[in-house]
Amino acid sequence: MLKKENLTEEERSKYIGILDQKANRLKILIEDLFEVSKATSKAITLNIVDVDIVSLLRQVKLELQDKIDATDLIFRWQLPEEKIVLPLDSQRTYRVFENLIVNITKYAMPHSRAYITMENTENHVKITMKNISATELDLNPSEITERFVRGDASRNTEGSGLGLAIAKSFTELQGGRLEISTDADLFTVEITFLK
């Protein structure tokens, strides 16, 4: 299209913008595919340190606040006041939380609530994220964490289809468990880290 000589400057600028968007999406797809491939083959070196998981989740919330505010969703956060320190890779755990919260902003039903809770027990810490999906989910929950599988079959949202696969891989690499359950349009993710 850009090779056409009769394009106006406005049309040329529009097409360059589209190309730029496509190139950026391709770059993100390649980076995500590389990350999930490394994670599933266990070719990632983890930097395990003592991490206050409550503070980390609050940091993700703060850094994603603009994206959250851009939706018409109501987020309900129920996090402990006290520190909960676990041996984790803070960068990978941040990515897990980020992917899951961004997933909510993309796929939750407009004007609905999202619930994010953290439960601290003697043996484990469980983070639960629940939202009502914009569409009824007829996928097997174990399939949705596979590469390129998306709950939104219409693909009207941006994304690589790798976010949940990355979140699951990074959680499991750190000895945690990420489980997804669906009940019609209720989408629930539970992350469990043993103490």
Model regions and ranges:
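Conserved micro-motifs of the catalytic ATP-binding
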Residues: 7, 11, 41-46, 85-88
